[in-house]
């Protein structure tokens, strides 16, 4: 039963209880102010009080029997409300977390527009000294090897020509030194004497 229906039932019960009490006591006496009750009035009041006490006992017994079921029902209602709130929060978080555009192609297009273009990168290919050319595409290793071998052969021919000229010069100089006779030393060495060093014998 909904809370509004429970309140209506409780209100109706209290109205009936109050009306029954008024009828019972008014039947005993119309005025209870500042006077003592007679014997008949006392017996009537005692009868009405007994009826109210028995009614209250039955009401409390019924409440004790229904109280566990009422508490269980309230707990289930609270748990269901908490589960609904948690589910609503989870759905809201999922919607907030999955706020990604539905079209993946548009996302890829935006990402490509944000990333720097490959054409904007400057060309780093240049010509190094001594004829060694750095190619812009290092993947073609055959071209690099061919260029290196060609430049190396030209460099080797130049060095070989210089070495050949140096060898010829060295050969001519060595022949001139061999042909030119070296001076022969014909002087007699001096013999030291007792008279003093550096005197020749007579």
Swiss-Prot record:
InterPro entries in UniProt: Mito_inner_translocase_sub, Tim10-like, Tim10-like_dom_sf
Which GO molecular function, any one, fits this protein according to its record? Answer: metal ion binding
GO biological process terms, alphabetically, are: protein transport
Q: How does it sit in the membrane?
A: Peripheral membrane protein
Where do the record's region annotations for Disordered lie?
Answer: 178-202
Q: Where is this motif: Twin CX3C motif?
A: 24-48
Annotated disulfide bonds = 24-48, 28-44
GO CC aspect terms: mitochondrial intermembrane space protein transporter complex; TIM22 mitochondrial import inner membrane insertion complex
Compartments, as annotated in UniProt: Mitochondrion inner membrane
Q: How does it assemble?
A: Component of the TIM22 complex.
Known function: Component of the TIM22 complex, a complex that mediates the import and insertion of multi-pass transmembrane proteins into the mitochondrial inner membrane. The TIM22 complex forms a twin-pore translocase that uses the membrane potential as the external driving force.
Query: What is the UniProt domain comment for this protein?
Result: The twin CX3C motif contains 4 conserved Cys residues that form 2 disulfide bonds in the mitochondrial intermembrane space. However, during the transit of timm10b from cytoplasm into mitochondrion, the Cys residues probably coordinate zinc, thereby preventing folding and allowing its transfer across mitochondrial outer membrane.
Similarity section:
Belongs to the small Tim family.
Q: What is this protein's name?
A: Mitochondrial import inner membrane translocase subunit Tim10 B
User: What species is given as this protein's source?
Assistant: Danio rerio
**Gene for this chain:** timm10b
